[in-house]
């Protein structure tokens, strides 16, 4: 059986590309690496890649029933709990301007990890996570 070398990217359909672009630049510090046309933008953090694709208004109805049901969340790893708290404060203070909402406040988990959840303008949930065994 062929093996893969890892996940290349995550692609999300969005309803307002400009608003979503601002969200991912502001809160996840993603950098645009390619913008082939007005309906698509590709980001990288240096090691992780994200693609955003504008949903055409005529196609929106076919995606609405699925929204929030297929993707549970995307996790981003943070170096330490203080960074989780810093990002939480940033989203609390500046999130509304970028269409961000807090989904779950910071919490210490049983496995020693620490995280909070927030949603992008289209309701895609992101977990900002400190995980002791891999955050080092």
Protein language model features and the residues they cover:
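Short glycine-enriched loop/turn motifs at secondary-structure junctions
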Residues: 3-6, 67-71, 109-110
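Conserved active-site tyrosine of GNAT-family acetyltransferases
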Residues: 20-25, 123
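Major-groove DNA-recognition helix of helix-turn-helix-type DNA-binding domains
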Residues: 28
């Amino acid at each position: 059986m062929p093996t893969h070398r890892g996940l290349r990217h995550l692609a999300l359909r969005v309803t307002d590309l400009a608003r979503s672009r601002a969200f991912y630049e502001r809160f996840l510090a993603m950098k645009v690496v390619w913008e082939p046309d007005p309906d698509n933008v590709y980001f990288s953090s240096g090691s992780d890649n994200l693609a955003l694709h504008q949903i055409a208004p005529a196609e929106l109805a076919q995606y609405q029933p699925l929204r929030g049901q297929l993707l549970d969340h995307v996790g981003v790893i943070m170096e330490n709990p203080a960074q989780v708290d810093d990002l939480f404060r940033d989203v609390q203070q500046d999130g509304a301007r970028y269409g961000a909402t807090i989904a779950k406040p910071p919490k210490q988990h049983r496995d020693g990890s620490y995280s909070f959840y927030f949603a992008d303008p289209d309701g895609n949930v992101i977990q900002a996570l400190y995980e002791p065994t891999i955050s080092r």
